A protein has these predicted regions:
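Conserved acidic
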Residues: 1-354
Length: 354
């Protein structure tokens, strides 16, 4: 069911006529499993797809205080001053990571009731399979590589020596970076499951099938269906952490009211991007100067984004590959790098108001 005249949450209104609209609805339906047709909104359709793959019923889970209180601060925006070798570059390029969050729908999520554990021990290469929240401090003045996104930003914003982090974020700190973490307590699920993975595969397969025929015009049936597919899975992640309304029992009974899924997916995507940026820096000597959600900025002497991309990053439409978003003169925003106004400065430049 598509109410195109009223639908402002998906791309149906971009169809130039009824023929293209019908073709787009049909294309999306054919790219998805049976009984997963579009219905009413991206959120409602995504919920139906997830439920379709959980034929035995979606696993229920009790949300611990850090999830309910939205205690986790995500590293979503960062920039740094230029290094000497970057200051002489002419151009600043932005690439977006394709399907960054969809690629993490296989993350382990809790089932049932979490346990409150005091002074838990993180076991390298093992604890990463335990979904949960950890109250963590960093000992000994440790600092991450200053050429990469600032992983200590959440501590500074909180103004506290201890903050709550998810398992994927702690895995990045403890296993990948060997940070000297100290854990005061945790809420951990003894049982966990990658229960979003099957639905993620359906969205991924639809994305690949539709993307293979979309030409980027934004008005044909394939482009419209592809954008609707993306709307579904991106909104589904945010919808897990939607504001709770009504009584607590009603919210708790909704199997897709899952703040933990939102937190774990976002942090898993961040960790994957961080590891990739670290590998790129070591392999090529080129380091990001900024990130904004799933987008990353690099400097270059080359004006063409397809040629300027670091050698270890792959342009393409697949999950985890990169799409070039924009290129601007570096000197237009260089003075804002390292400050809070950088991303606004970029958008003002692109709008022609700077």
């Amino acid at each position: 069911m598509v109410l195109a005249g009223y639908e402002n949450r998906a791309a149906w209104q971009d169809a130039p006529d009824g023929r293209v609209l019908l073709a787009a609805v049909t294309a999306l339906a054919e790219a998805m499993p049976p009984a997963c047709n579009y219905y009413y909104s991206p959120n409602a359709t995504a919920a139906a797809v997830i439920s379709h793959h959980a034929r035995g019923g979606l696993p229920a889970a009790t949300m611990p205080p850090p999830a309910l209180e939205r205690a986790v601060t995500h590293v979503a925006s960062w920039s740094r001053p230029l290094m000497d070798e970057e200051a002489g570059c002419d151009w600043l390029h932005r690439w977006d990571t394709n399907g960054a969050q969809l690629a993490t729908w296989g993350v382990k999520l809790g089932i049932g009731d979490p346990e409150h554990v005091m002074s838990p021990r993180w076991v390298p290469k093992k604890s990463k399979y335990t979904a949960g929240y950890w109250l963590v401090s960093i000992e000994g003045g440790w600092r991450p590589d200053m050429r990469l996104p600032d992983l200590l930003g959440p501590w500074r914003r909180a103004g506290e020596p201890q903050i709550w982090v998810t398992t994927p974020f702690l895995e990045l700190l403890a296993d990948d970076l060997a940070a000297p973490v100290s854990i005061a307590e945790a809420w951990l699920w003894p049982q966990s499951s990658a229960w979003l993975e099957a639905a993620g595969h359906s969205f991924r397969d639809a994305r690949a099938a539709l993307g293979a025929r979309a030409d980027g015009c934004g008005r044909c049936e394939w482009c419209i269906a592809l954008r609707v597919d993306k709307d579904r899975y991106t909104r589904a992640t945010g919808n897990c952490a939607r504001r709770r309304t009504g009584d607590a029992a009603t919210a708790a009974a909704d199997p897709l009211q899952r703040e933990d899924a939102n937190d774990h997916i976002i942090d898993k995507a961040l960790a994957i991007d961080y590891r990739r940026q670290l590998r790129t820096g070591k392999a090529t000597g080129r380091w990001p100067v900024a990130i904004f959600n799933d987008a990353v900025y690099y400097t270059s002497d080359l004006p063409d984004g397809n040629q300027a991309i670091p050698a270890s990053m792959t342009l393409g439409t697949g999950l985890g590959q990169y799409s070039h978003e924009t290129t601007i003169p570096l000197d237009a925003v260089a003075g804002e790098l390292g400050g809070r106004g950088f991303h606004r400065a970029v958008e003002r430049y692109l709008r022609g108001t700077r």
